[in-house]
Amino acid sequence: MFVFIAKLLIFSSVITSAFTCYQCFIDENDSRRLCLGHILTEYNVRNVDSCYKTLDRIFNNEEKVIEAGKVGRGYDLTLKNILMAEIMPIVEEFDQQLNYDTEYESRLQAAANNFIAAASSLPRVSGCLPPCGFQVQGAVYNCVTCQYDSCEFPLDCPGKEITVQENNRTQMWCSVPFLLPADVEIVWRYAQDRTMLRERFDDVTVGVDPLYSIPSARPEQSGTYQCEVLSQEQSLVRLYFYLTVVPVAQTYHVHLQDLCAQALRPEPQFPPSFSFWLPRPALLITCLTATMLLIFLSLGAMCRLWYQIRTNVSNPA
C-alpha cells in the first residue's frame, strides 16, 4: 500500500511539473497509460518517473518542438491532431505492456521528428505590427503556455495632426496596417479639446464605415476625433485625430503679412553685370504711363493755344 501511494505521489508531481508543450494536447490519462510499462534496461525495473523525464527531454523542453508549434491563430487544432497522430498509436501499443527504455526512446524520438516536420509546414504567424492595437491575427501559439501570445501593444495609437482651412473638405480614415476580423464595429467620437480620456468624448456615429468626412470644415469643429474598432464588444484599437480648422480671416491676415514682408524685403545686392542699369518691369511701366500722360497733356495744351489764336485772328478788335 505504501509503495502504491509513493508511486501515486511521484506521478502527481511529474504531471504537475510537466505542463508544457506535450501536455497542451495529450491527455494526462493517456500519458499515464503510456508510461506505466516503462522499464529501465540497466536495472530491469519499472520506472514511471524516467518515462516522464524522457517525454520532457524529447517534447516539452526541446526547442525544435516549441518552434514548430509557433503557428498562426486557428491552427492550434491542426497542431493537436498532428501530435495525437504520432503519440496515440504508441499509447495504444504500450498500454498495459512492459517495454524497455530504449524502445521508448526510439519510438518517442521518431514521433517528435515527425511532429516537427509536419508542424513546421503549417502557416506561420504574420507577426506583430507596432505601435498599437490588439492584433488577433498577429498572435502566435506558445506550446509552453498552451495559449496564444498577444502582441502586447497598447490599444491607443499615437494621435495624428490634421490642419485644414475653413470651408474646406477634410477626411479621416480609421485604418490600421494589421488584419481585422470580419465582424468589426466602428465607433466615431468627438471631444472639443485635445485629449485621450474616454469620458471626454461623445459618440458621433456607430457602424462599419471606416471613413469620417467633414464636407465644409468650421472653426468650431476643431478638436479630437476618436475612432474605436470593436469585435464582439471587445476593443481592438483606438485611433486619434487632432483637427485644427484655420478661420478664413486668419488665413487672409497671414497671406497679407507675407505680401507685406515680401514688399519690404530689401533687394539682394549683386555687382552689376552690365555698364547700364535695367529698371524693374513695374517701374518701367509706371514711367511709360507718366510719359504718355505728359504727351497727351502737351497735345491738349497746344490744341487749346492754336484754337485761341485762330479765334483772335477771325475776330479782330
UniProtKB/Swiss-Prot annotation:
SMART domains linked: IG
Stretches assigned to the Ig-like domain: 123-237
Record has Transport as a keyword: no
A biological process term (GO) from this entry: fusion of sperm to egg plasma membrane involved in single fertilization
Subunit structure: Forms a complex with izumo1 and tmem81 on spermatocyte cell membrane. The complex binds to oocyte protein bncr.
Cytoplasmic topological segments: 303-317
InterPro entries: Ig-like_dom, Ig-like_dom_sf, Ig-like_fold, Ig_sub, SPACA6
Domain of life: Eukaryota
Homology family: Belongs to the SPACA6 family.
Annotated S-S bridges: C21-C143, C24-C146, C35-C51, C128-C151, C132-C157, C174-C227
One GO CC term, this protein: acrosomal membrane
Domain-related comment: The extracellular domain shows strong structural similarity with IZUMO1 but does not interact with the IZUMO1 receptor IZUMO1R/JUNO.
Transmembrane spans: 282-302
Keyword vocabulary terms for this entry: Cytoplasmic vesicle, Disulfide bond, Fertilization, Glycoprotein, Immunoglobulin domain, Membrane, Signal, Transmembrane, Transmembrane helix
Tissue: Expressed in testis.
Organism, scientific name: Danio rerio (Zebrafish)
Biological function: Sperm protein required for fusion of sperm with the egg membrane during fertilization. May regulate the expression of sperm surface protein DCST2.
Protein's name according to its UniProt entry: Sperm acrosome membrane-associated protein 6
